[in-house]
Amino acid sequence: MTDIVDELKWRGLFAQSTDEDALRKALADGPVTFYCGFDPTAASLHVGHLVQVLTMRRLQQAGLKPLALVGGATGQIGDPRPTAERTLNDPETIAAWVQRLRGQIEPFLTFEGPNAATMVNNLDWTAGMSAIEFLRDIGKHFRVNKMLTKDSVARRLESQEGISYTEFSYQLLQGMDFLELYRRHGCTLQQGGSDQWGNLTAGIDLIHRLEPGAVVHALATPLMTKADGTKFGKSESGAVWLDPEMTTPYAFYQFWLNVDDRDVSRYLRILSFKSREELAELEKLTEERPQARNAQRALAEELTTLVHGGEQCAAVIAASKALFGQGDLAELDEATLSAALSEVPHATVAELGPLVDLLVEVGLAPSKSGARRTVKEGGAYVNNVKVVDGEVAPDAGELLHGRWLVLRRGKKNLAAVEVGPVG
């Protein structure tokens, strides 16, 4: 079996650790309990969280025991962002988000067997602690000069807004999490992103002060980046969420399908569970025929299956093919079709007019004369059927599920018309 540290390094998942040799020894000596934390700062995890969630899954498959922490306490504070203070959410909202995040994380882990996963909430050990107890038992062991060196804190101190004592104290809470999990579960490894390094080591320092002789470790993964310099995890419409109500499975699939050729091989190593041989073959295909997007399809299919399930992934693939003329649109169920069409330009009309008007309405043609030219050149399609007369209105019987028409100009330009109340 491949050494898990070597595997993480090969996949680009190893940014740094506190003591690599000591970590390797701990992993070789026996089962290691580790944890990774997720703060409920929104109603859903987003694709940026997949690095940590899937790394937890990878570590569990290698024999480690995971503790998945959802921060009912830290979520009420918020890790300092480099730019501005977070908006505080009320405790009831955070409690609801804790449950939603638990439900998203649990399917990725195994809760049976010798290294069964455990879900934990840091509100369990902070809720009953008074401010005096926190300052005496935890705050006493932190040094402000060291806390000030954390990147996000330093940047905020240089800004006009500065940083509140609330957010400045966040690293004390995260440090206490590691201490409590060490005491309660024998947790000796914390996993997180490299931007969390200061918080990871804060917990180690606290344990060393209060538990002399304890051997504990931190492991940081690199931040996901994009070759074009834009922020990873954002589409044109905003963040890409794991919740299907916030980002449809179709949009989720398309996000990965549209990954830049310069990024796709790296993303596959980081996020996929395919073997080295399979990944090497996909890298080769990308070099030889990038236009086929084989690597992107493999990435999109695997991650959509992991997040939304195989049945939903199959429906999304069928919709993706059908929209571009490689399948029967009429075979798509209404929910899948509606979700897919929500991601393309569309217009709502009270009744169907001539096709040339519809092409202009949805933006597939700049004018009626442009629409007529598209039809004349054989480039206009309604529900994947080529149109020969643009002056005729589509028949109501052509409406998919009684409400949709899919219009296409050429091979790739899609739009939709929905018949219904306007306004």
Curated annotation (Swiss-Prot):
Family matches, as PROSITE patterns: AA_TRNA_LIGASE_I, S4
UniProt cross-references to SMART domains, sorted A to Z: S4
Pfam families to which the protein is assigned, alphabetical: SYY_C-terminal, tRNA-synt_1b
The keyword RNA-binding appears for this protein: yes
Motif ('KMSKS' region): 231-235
UniProt-listed Enzyme Commission number(s): 6.1.1.1
Protein name: Tyrosine--tRNA ligase
Organism this protein belongs to: Streptomyces griseus subsp. griseus (strain JCM 4626 / CBS 651.72 / NBRC 13350 / KCC S-0626 / ISP 5235)
